[in-house]
């Protein structure tokens, strides 16, 4: 938010389900960062997102997004485990890529430092799917 204030522009940050988001009018740009589009695992839902974005964009507006590819999920992350121990906490990140469905599941266990000095353990399962570049363009 500090960067927004420094920019001098009125930037509206929203957190909504991208399959159902609503705006108060049209905008010049929509930005979806950090591979958010990979959370959309169904082609119909991705089409819904694209239609919503198109609906809220100015005629010359731009939609900026990034997506991880099948190559990244299969070859780089694959069925691997990544673990790190940092000053503020630790994590264990287990990946499982299903070749048949194209679904990648992150089993993420976080150990976060509490003010008491104890560590708090949380666990999240994150499901993501790469979308074929040609399919995405055709939608």
Predicted features and spans:
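Conserved SAM-binding loop
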Residues: 1-4
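Conserved SAM-binding strand-loop segment of SAM-dependent methyltransferases
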Residues: 6-23
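Generic enzyme active-site microenvironment
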Residues: 15, 33, 64
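Short catalytic/ligand-binding loop motif for oxyanion handling, primarily in non-cytosolic enzymes
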Residues: 22, 38-40, 71-75
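Residues lining hydrophobic/aromatic ligand-binding pockets adjacent to catalytic sites
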Residues: 22, 32-33, 47, 69
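A short SAM/SAH-binding and catalytic strip from SAM-dependent methyltransferases
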Residues: 28-45
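A short glycine-rich, Lys/Arg-flanked "PGG" loop and its adjoining helix->strand segment in the class I
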Residues: 47-62
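SAM-dependent methyltransferase
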Residues: 64-135
